[in-house]
């Protein structure tokens, strides 16, 4: 079979001789869908262009950051101006406080904010901070929730770990793993039991605000509020991981859509992706008394040469300034439109499925209409073999989907009628391909 992207093929062959698996993040290798990954050379609005000159409507959006669309003029202008002033100073800059003020204004649970460069750094620091603040060692996480690649939270992780069917990661010591209690998601009774057995030693519960790394999973009614109640009762902290959902699912993140109205707040939150507008930026924030345990005012150490990088801060300020309530309303409407079209095409092809949704994020789970997906076990039981032919049919039609059934679909403010029509027109053939798949 002749490839229709020979330049990407050549680039991948070269990359495999230079980098493990030819990639710098495993999901990019197309491991669960097969075929050669496409090498992208440019992005504009709702579109990606690969090294062979082929254009795709993008439903990955850089895994979330491109909320406004790729290469948004206001973001580019801010970045260009920042670059002209210098790339990195090794000192504080005005936009660090400007971005922190925007986050604090939008997310009332944030009283202090610390900038870092990656989501993994944010969750790693939040866990260290929780242990330092409480004087306890154990952390509760949920199977299928992904919090970056720090050792203690890779047990039963979602995302690329789920894609590769790995239970965790080699290189994580037994002693490190023993300090993490892994519980089933959406099961408050299991959380209550864990605190009954280990409560005096539990520093924190960490959870994705709405999981999106085992496919999208909606927190059950009262689940996150219940975590807040239980942690408070036992003197532990609740860490809400909004690296993916923060400023993507809503103006104040997923907590702003749900928790604020329900009357509870996490002790710490982590942010990434959208907060940097496509630049490597992340943050952790929360209660002032907890955050002030960080150095230089507290005993918990954290540092980073490129934390608060001026170019990244400029991109973040421009992105959040332009991410208005109207933008979220538009993306929400497009998300509902596309998920309805997806479900209709799968129904017409006779493919059993459920659409999993959290705000404007959604994913499809095959063979799950009877029970849906509420936790990691449900996600693993789906007919995931149907996704690869579905993915490649869409790819051949010029639509770039996440190369894993365990990832969310992302839309942006740049997905106009032309982009949406191209996606919708490609769905019937992809649905038929999924229908014809066999395990």
Curated annotation (Swiss-Prot):
EC nos: 5.4.3.8
Pathway entry: Porphyrin-containing compound metabolism; protoporphyrin-IX biosynthesis; 5-aminolevulinate from L-glutamyl-tRNA(Glu): step 2/2
GO BP: protoporphyrinogen IX biosynthetic process
Disulfide bond sites: none
Keywords per UniProt: Cytoplasm, Isomerase, Porphyrin biosynthesis, Pyridoxal phosphate
Record-listed N6-(pyridoxal phosphate)lysine modification sites: 273
InterPro entries (alphabetical): 4pyrrol_synth_GluAld_NH2Trfase, Aminotrans_3, Aminotrans_3_PPA_site, PyrdxlP-dep_Trfase, PyrdxlP-dep_Trfase_major, PyrdxlP-dep_Trfase_small
A molecular function (GO) term: pyridoxal phosphate binding
SUPFAM superfamilies listed in its UniProt record: PLP-dependent transferases
A single GO cellular-component term on record: cytoplasm
Reactions accelerated catalytically: (S)-4-amino-5-oxopentanoate = 5-aminolevulinate
Cofactor field: pyridoxal 5'-phosphate
UniProt subcellular location: Cytoplasm
Family: Belongs to the class-III pyridoxal-phosphate-dependent aminotransferase family. HemL subfamily.
Subunit structure: Homodimer.
PANTHER family the record matches: GLUTAMATE-1-SEMIALDEHYDE 2,1-AMINOMUTASE, GLUTAMATE-1-SEMIALDEHYDE 2,1-AMINOMUTASE 1, CHLOROPLASTIC-RELATED
Name this polypeptide is given: Glutamate-1-semialdehyde 2,1-aminomutase
Gene name of the record: hemL
């Amino acid at each position: 079979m002749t490839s229709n992207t020979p330049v990407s093929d050549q680039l991948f062959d070269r990359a495999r001789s230079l980098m493990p698996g030819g990639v710098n993040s495993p999901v990019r290798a197309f491991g669960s869908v097969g075929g050669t990954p496409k090498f992208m050379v440019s992005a504009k609005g709702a579109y990606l262009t690969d090294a062979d000159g082929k254009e795709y409507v993008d439903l990955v959006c850089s895994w979330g950051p491109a909320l406004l669309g790729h290469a948004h003029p206001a973001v580019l202008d801010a970045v260009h101006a920042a670059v002209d002033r210098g790339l990195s100073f090794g000192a504080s800059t005005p936009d660090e406080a400007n971005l922190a003020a925007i986050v604090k204004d939008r997310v009332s649970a944030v009283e202090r904010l610390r900038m870092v460069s990656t989501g993994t750094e944010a969750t790693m620091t939040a866990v260290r901070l929780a242990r330092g603040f409480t004087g306890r060692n154990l952390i509760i996480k949920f199977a299928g929730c992904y919090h970056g690649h720090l050792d203690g939270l890779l047990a039963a992780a979602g995302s690329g770990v789920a894609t590769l069917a790995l239970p965790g990661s080699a290189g994580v010591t037994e002693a490190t793993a023993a300090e993490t209690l892994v519980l089933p998601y959406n099961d408050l009774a299991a959380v209550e039991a864990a605190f009954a057995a280990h409560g005096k030693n539990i520093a924190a519960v960490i959870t994705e605000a709405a999981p999106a790394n085992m496919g999208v999973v909606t927190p059950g009614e009262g689940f996150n509020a219940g975590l807040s109640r239980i942690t408070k009762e036992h003197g532990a902290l609740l860490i809400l991981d909004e690296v993916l959902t923060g400023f993507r699912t809503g103006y104040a993140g997923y907590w702003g859509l749900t928790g604020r109205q329900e009357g509870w707040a996490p002790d710490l939150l982590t942010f990434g992706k959208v907060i940097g507008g496509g630049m490597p930026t992340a943050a952790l924030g929360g209660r002032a008394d907890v955050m002030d345990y960080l150095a230089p005012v507290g005993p918990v150490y954290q540092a980073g040469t490129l934390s608060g990088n001026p170019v990244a801060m400029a991109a973040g300020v421009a992105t959040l300034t332009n991410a208005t309530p109207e933008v979220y309303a538009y993306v929400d409407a497009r998300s509902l439109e596309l998920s309805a079209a997806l479900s209709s095409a799968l129904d017409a092809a006779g493919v059993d499925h459920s659409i999993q949704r959290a705000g404007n994020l959604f994913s499809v789970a095959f063979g799950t209409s009877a029970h849906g997906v509420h936790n990691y076990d449900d996600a693993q039981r789906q007919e995931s073999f149907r996704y690869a032919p579905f993915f490649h049919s869409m790819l051949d039609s010029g639509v770039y989907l996440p190369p894993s059934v365990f990832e969310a679909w992302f839309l942006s403010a740049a997905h106009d009628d032309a982009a949406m029509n191209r996606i919708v027109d490609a769905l019937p053939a992809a649905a038929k391909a999924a229908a014809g798949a066999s395990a």
